[in-house]
Amino acid sequence: MKVTVLVGGVGGARFLLGVQHLLGLGQFARDDARDPDAHEVTAVVNVGDDTWMFGVRICPDLDTCMYTLGGGIDPDRGWGHRDETWHAKEELAAYGVQPDWFGLGDRDLATHLVRSQMLRAGYPLSQVTEALCDRWNPGARLLPASDDRSETHVVITDPDTDERRAIHFQEWWVRYRAKVPTHSFAFVGADKATTAPGVTDAIADADVVLLAPSNPVVSIGSILAIPGIRGALRSTSAKIIGYSPIIAGKPLRGMADECLSVIGVASTSEAVGRHYGARSGTGILDGWLVHEGDSAQIDGVEVEAVPLLMTDPATTAEMVRAGVRLAGVTL
């Protein structure tokens, strides 16, 4: 079975662990598997968070997925490298290097240095990611949504000057924690970007396409902003099943509610499902999973309520199983 998943960072990576647990891949590979090549997982990963910082290219969501599936993630934070140290960050601070609100761990820095060296040598991000994954063996194909620049920027009212300005998503998220007056999001470069090699084929050839319960605005929304992806979703023969990132009016994790508020979408499972829309209309969904106790009525979309708390890979695997079942695919 071929499963293609659209994902963001921490939540998306944990969802991918559930996919692998269900299919017996990656860390959950079984020695007695009849056919270890029977299943294939491809993750189309958000690149809107990517940025140059301290002279290196940082790809937070790609790295979080790579570290998580490769067993190198910091289990407490859910991002960054396990057993991290912060000597480089301390030295940069001692030199007074800005920005002082963003820190890179020493082990994590090695990843960024290798990536930046390869990018400067002319390799596209998709090839760089493949090379980095050779070290981690994540058990899934990780594809950046695009090799081109497609960064999420945020229009805010500057708290110091009271004037409107656009800042990179990382500054809004890390420095301001989304707690400044916010007016809009812009996917800079997305209109001129193209999908990375393999992305549209992964969607077209899939047996099922899953939208992880990642942020619908700055993760999934950023992916959908890249020309060609929405069209690939609308034309694939696979059923497209989405997972609500909202449980009882609150985000599963992160600050999805803050992002939804900016674009005028309520923080409910139904509102987010309607935001994605039905593929029978002009949207992208065939099915929509909401948390037990929640409900949603979306014309043209089959809705089912199941437990959506990703407490561990085994529990998350049952979420994935429910989505595959809703798509009518037999494991």
From Swiss-Prot:
Pathway(s) this gene product operates in, as recorded in its UniProt entry: Cofactor biosynthesis; coenzyme F420 biosynthesis
UniProt-listed Enzyme Commission number(s): 2.7.8.28
EC primary class: transferase
Classification via InterPro entries: CofD (IPR002882), CofD-like_dom_sf (IPR038136), FbiA/CofD (IPR010115)
An MF annotation (GO) of this entry: magnesium ion binding
CDD domains xref list: CofD_like (cd07186)
Gene3D superfamilies from the UniProt entry: CofD-like domain (1.10.8.240), CofD-like domains (3.40.50.10680)
Pfam families membership: CofD (PF01933)
Swiss-Prot/TrEMBL cofactor(s): Mg(2+)
Reactions it catalyzes: enolpyruvoyl-2-diphospho-5'-guanosine + 7,8-didemethyl-8-hydroxy-5-deazariboflavin = dehydro coenzyme F420-0 + GMP + H(+)
Any one Gene Ontology BP term: F420-0 metabolic process
Residues where 7,8-didemethyl-8-hydroxy-5-deazariboflavin binds: D63
Signal peptide positions (record): none
Keywords for this protein: Magnesium, Transferase
Recorded superkingdom: Bacteria
PANTHER family cross-referenced by the UniProt entry: 2-PHOSPHO-L-LACTATE TRANSFERASE
Physiological role: Catalyzes the transfer of the phosphoenolpyruvate moiety from enoylpyruvoyl-2-diphospho-5'-guanosine (EPPG) to 7,8-didemethyl-8-hydroxy-5-deazariboflavin (FO) with the formation of dehydro coenzyme F420-0 and GMP.
Assembly behavior: Homodimer.
NCBIfam families reported in the protein's UniProt record: F420_cofD
Family: Belongs to the CofD family.
Protein name: Phosphoenolpyruvate transferase
Organism: Mycobacterium sp. (strain JLS)
Gene name per UniProt: fbiA
